[in-house]
């Protein structure tokens, strides 16, 4: 993925966010974590938002509507957790849909922006562990009352992932694409 393509996606999604939610995006800063899916922190006229683009090569939501339904259900659950007081980002629905789709078929979700950095394993203090336990308890209590998923939205496929990784690595090596090679090293 070249930068121009990502900038084009960000601009198209920003326009769609304005139409769907009435939120004007002033700036989109890419977040360089993860694999294929592009994420941005978008500064808006209201508050910063987190936007996740569901890459068609990874999720194929346009071919598998059941995947979209399952992912939307997990986003709905996350939003319910947020509304019940569990500390997690809220998700912006539009007409009860949690994954939005632009006119050209870009699929994305809009979430509240939450500042912070993950703590390294083993580095939480006693107060942080206590708070984590409280919110974990709230989460489990709320989820007991929620309609469960029919099946997980995503099933890990280690062999498939490794095949895809090797294919991408070989293509990047042949092309001398250092950006993709760096993504591969991090994945």
Predicted regions and their residues:
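Short N-terminal amphipathic alpha-helix/helix-capping patch enriched in small hydrophobics
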Residues: 13, 35-38, 74
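Short secondary-structure capping/turn micro-motifs that flank functional sites
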Residues: 34, 97-98, 155-156
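A cross-family kinase active-site recognition segment
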Residues: 122-186
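Juxta-kinase regulatory segment immediately upstream of eukaryotic protein kinase catalytic domains
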Residues: 1-28
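ATP-binding pocket architecture of kinase catalytic cores
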Residues: 44-148
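ATP-binding glycine-rich phosphate-binding loop
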Residues: 23-43
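Short, N-terminal intrinsically disordered low-complexity segments that are rich in Pro/Gly
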Residues: 2-7, 29-32, 60-67
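Proline- and acidic/polar-enriched loop/turn elements at helix boundaries
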Residues: 30, 93-94, 151-152
């Amino acid at each position: 993925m070249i930068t121009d393509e990502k900038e084009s996606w960000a601009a198209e999604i920003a326009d769609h966010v304005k139409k769907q939610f009435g939120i004007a995006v002033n700036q989109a800063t890419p977040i360089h974590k993860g694999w294929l899916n592009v994420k941005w922190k978008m500064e808006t006229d209201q508050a910063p938002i987190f936007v996740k683009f569901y890459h068609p090569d990874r999720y194929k939501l346009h071919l598998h509507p059941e995947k979209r339904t399952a992912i939307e259900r997990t986003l709905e659950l996350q939003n319910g957790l947020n509304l019940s007081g569990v500390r997690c980002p809220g998700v912006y629905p539009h007409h009860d849909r949690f994954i939005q789709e632009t006119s050209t078929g870009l699929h994305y979700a809009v979430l509240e922006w939450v500042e912070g950095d993950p703590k390294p394993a083993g580095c939480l203090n006693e107060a942080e562990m206590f708070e984590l336990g409280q919110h974990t308890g709230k989460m489990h209590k709320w989820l007991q009352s929620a309609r469960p998923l029919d099946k997980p939205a995503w099933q890990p496929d280690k062999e498939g992932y490794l095949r895809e990784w090797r294919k991408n690595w070989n293509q990047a090596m042949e092309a001398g694409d250092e950006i993709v090679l760096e993504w591969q090293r991090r994945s």
